[in-house]
Amino acid sequence: MDEAAGLLNRVDDELPWGNACRRTPGYLEVQRATCYGRLGLGVEASALWTQVLDHVPMTARRDRGVYLARHAAAAAKAEEPEHAVEIGREAAQIAVETGSARMRGELTALERVMRPWHDAPVGRELAQALAPVNERE
């Protein structure tokens, strides 16, 4: 990832594919945060998602919702289930508003990560927050 940042200026913008790294602000940091989360590095991923989301415009609803869902999963992996629910609630609201299948997939991943708390009050809060999303399926 560190080496990739130095190669961004070599991306051919004439291609109809493969230039998301030039079109998406913070693209490499999004990829880094995603990788950290999928590797189970919840603390690192959560911190990076906080930074990334500070720069995602509110108008980029679908991307923002996906990133929020990934941030919520990272918070759960960092053993911060209450924070995960707080973030997940915002992602769920965006998912209902947009109908994004990609976001629903990320929220399903959040549900899996939150399974250790499914019988706890925080788990029930998550289920309640995600209920409108699951109703749309």
Write out the residue ranges for each language-model feature.
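Conserved binding/catalytic microenvironments
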Residues: 1-137
